[in-house]
Amino acid sequence: MLSLVGRVASASASGALRGLSPSAALPQAQLLLRAAPAGVHPARDYAAQASAAPKAGTATGRIVAVIGAVVDVQFDEGLPPILNALEVQGRDSRLVLEVAQHLGESTVRTIAMDGTEGLVRGQKVLDSGAPIKIPVGPETLGRIMNVIGEPIDERGPIKTKQFAPIHAEAPEFIEMSVEQEILVTGIKVVDLLAPYAKGGKIGLFGGAGVGKTVLIMELINNVAKAHGGYSVFAGVGERTREGNDLYHEMIESGVINLKDATSKVALVYGQMNEPPGARARVALTGLTVAEYFRDQEGQDVLLFIDNIFRFTQAGSEVSALLGRIPSAVGYQPTLATDMGTMQERITTTKKGSITSVQAIYVPADDLTDPAPATTFAHLDATTVLSRAIAELGIYPAVDPLDSTSRIMDPNIVGNEHYDVARGVQKILQDYKSLQDIIAILGMDELSEEDKLTVSRARKIQRFLSQPFQVAEVFTGHMGKLVPLKETIKGFQQILAGEYDHLPEQAFYMVGPIEEAVAKADKLAEEHGS
């Protein structure tokens, strides 16, 4: 049976080879060479290729197949390069397709940036001659746009003359800046144990419902107001309701001003209901807006991405639609490349900086999953949100032992900050080690020294909680922003034993240490009466 299959295969192969005589093969090879756009190099430098390609923008093709979000388009001449944007003609709403693959000599396989309902074979498609271009500049502040730069806030067109392609090269090594400076957020647990670097990349890791989006909203509230620069928020594959809530909260807090041009933030949304093409590109759209402020205006920009996992997830969907063989856990084989291409553009140059805060959903709370694990390599600081801490009612539910920062170094943060942070982590680690003994034998079996460790650790654990301004309506506590000096002083005094006499509940949901003392006095009065 096998030999028969082999004979048939070899016969068909030789038949195919006989059919393709040298004289027939030569013009075909020449045709393929002619079809390649000018300035294209063999390297997979698609962004540069798309930008360097001739900007004719007049090639017209026709749709030959529609398979969900994948559309095949045939061009009789002028095959568009990879990553070029194509526009479908004869539709009420604008539909942009991005070239993903070349199938043979005259057909391209594209990914749609919007729904493909109503598309029919034979419809005309126009090559724009460039990658997707979006509006950039101060006019984008206070506005919401989608992946292709269309305003979706019902406030008319974005009046700007400046447009930029969403695919670009990362800055050269020579342009990068190496200065290190702490970015104070006003959140105690973050500033003390895993401080953020100005111009760095920060990851917020956590499973479903542990508070990633609330923490991002608080950071926008604290840092955008205190830092005074521009912010860009990219909503990637998250809930539309949260995007809407965020927009209205920004209007109420004055970060977005509808009356004049004093808005501080630009919003770019590609939410859960969007096709995978839009979700895979919307992070790049947000990044392009931020790059303009960094490179052209010399600003220190804050870029918030919620959620970077959805970027990977959308890339995985696109990869499957294009028929690529999946890699580990079903992710796309180009996972590290896709992530690296985007993350390398988020950097600090000599002109300005982009500090990015990225919420990272951790599937099934598994930090070894390829999506969060690939993201780890790019980050300067990681803030890990823990379900176990959230279950204790301690918010923000930041894990003080798992969260890390590259700048937690005495040469950068200073000896006092470093010593207090390490002291806090040591006492919390000791408490964690004693928990098994407490569970089996109870507190009474501990030595006096261990009892003191447990008492201080529980106070520190509660003092790491903090009421947020954006969560006032849920908690009933007024939001607090704590300066770094106050944070260090408070934890230093708890470690020194100055507040051993206060009850641990006095340290829960307060700002600086003075509030804990006042709360303890209030509790004593209530208890006394």
UniProtKB/Swiss-Prot annotation:
NCBIfam families: atpD. The modification Phosphoserine is found at residues 433, 529. ATP binds at residues 209, 211-214, 239. The modification N6-acetyllysine is found at residues 124, 133, 161, 198, 259, 264, 426, 480, 485, 522. This is ATP synthase F(1) complex catalytic subunit beta, mitochondrial. Residues 1-46 form a transit peptide. ADP binds at residues 209-214. The lineage of its organism: Eukaryota, Metazoa, Chordata, Craniata, Vertebrata. Belongs to the ATPase alpha/beta chains family. It is an enzyme of class 7 (translocase). GO terms for molecular function: angiostatin binding; ATP binding; ATP hydrolysis activity; MHC class I protein binding; proton-transporting ATP synthase activity, rotational mechanism; proton-transporting ATPase activity, rotational mechanism. It catalyses: ATP + H2O + 4 H(+)(in) = ADP + phosphate + 5 H(+)(out). Disulfide bonds: none annotated. Signal peptide: none annotated. It is found in: Mitochondrion inner membrane.
